[in-house]
């Protein structure tokens, strides 16, 4: 038997508000609690047998490591040339070696080239979070989160700020969910907390899988999330 409830306007407003709140929490949720050492050890043991095959799927022709190191060091020293900035963003967006790519990306490159001297003058105590906040405020649109996070990584890679994207974020969440089957999963990263969660996850895994490097764990998570985890 099916029952139909008659809702007045107040009930509808309350129900709509509740639904909107649930949608907001579903969209913005992050990892409920930090990864424990026991969980990190279990995940390290879980990925060890597949680590190298997954890692070897990474495309170094599309993302050449030597080129990355060159512009990364320029950013870390706070003196990237316009060419360094262009190369870095073309690399991140997967356009390396391409002559044609979206005009919106060309415009964003020019915008960041214009902003970098201002950042260098204004930032003062350039902690990773201050850097992230500065670029978030100046680019100030949701579509630039991954780019802002990448700039923050380039400047602060020595602080183990990861190259976050939807793939390694998805990989992290999928591995955590093998131990937390009821854990809600956020679809895409969108804020500073997500970056820190990924950073702490990678450090914890590395502590229990020391024959790997942080860079290798990053690439593994990218390929694992891209090729082995179902997108939701």
Stretch-by-stretch model annotation:
Residues 3-71, 79, 83, 162-232:
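C-terminal accessory module of base-excision DNA glycosylases/AP lyases that mediates lesion recognition
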Residues 22, 31, 40-136:
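Long, highly charged, low-complexity intrinsically disordered interaction regions
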Residues 95-96, 157, 223-227:
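A short structural micro-motif
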Residues 132-157:
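Helix-hairpin-helix
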Residues 1-4, 12-15, 86, 105, ...:
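Generic N-terminal initiation segments characterized by hydrophobic and/or small/turn-forming residues
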Residues 116-123, 138-139, 160, 176, ...:
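Generic hydrophobic, helix-prone segments enriched in Leu/Val/Ile
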